[in-house]
Amino acid sequence: MKATSLILAFILSTSLAKAQNAPQVSYFPLQNVKLLDSPFLQAQQTDLHYILALNPDRLLAPFLREAGLTPKAPSYTNWENTGLDGHIGGHYISALSMMYAATGDTAVYNRLNYMLDELHRAQQAVGTGFIGGTPGSL
């Protein structure tokens, strides 16, 4: 009798769980969200200041160098000059894109366009459509 009750309880609980509506996920544009004064806004502002403090010419140096163009500044060290050159540049473009979508900050927009214009210049110099900062990638 006890086993039958347990089985019945299990069947009822699982069927009730299945009867509930599954949560619906939908995407929305980042610009539809505005952060209020909070730790989240402070974190966003910290990130904004950090990405604008980076020197875009140093992040572009590997791409320009591989394209046969003269860089405007030396590469950053560590990841950017030991075989993964240009790696951070891709993350940087993503960060700028998301920050602009979230804030509409014109300095971020201008920095993003500068990065894209310079990468396009490197791409044109290579002539194959490829853009690469890793040594020997072309």
Range-by-range predicted roles:
Residues 20-138:
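Glycan-recognition and catalytic cores of secretory/periplasmic carbohydrate-active enzymes
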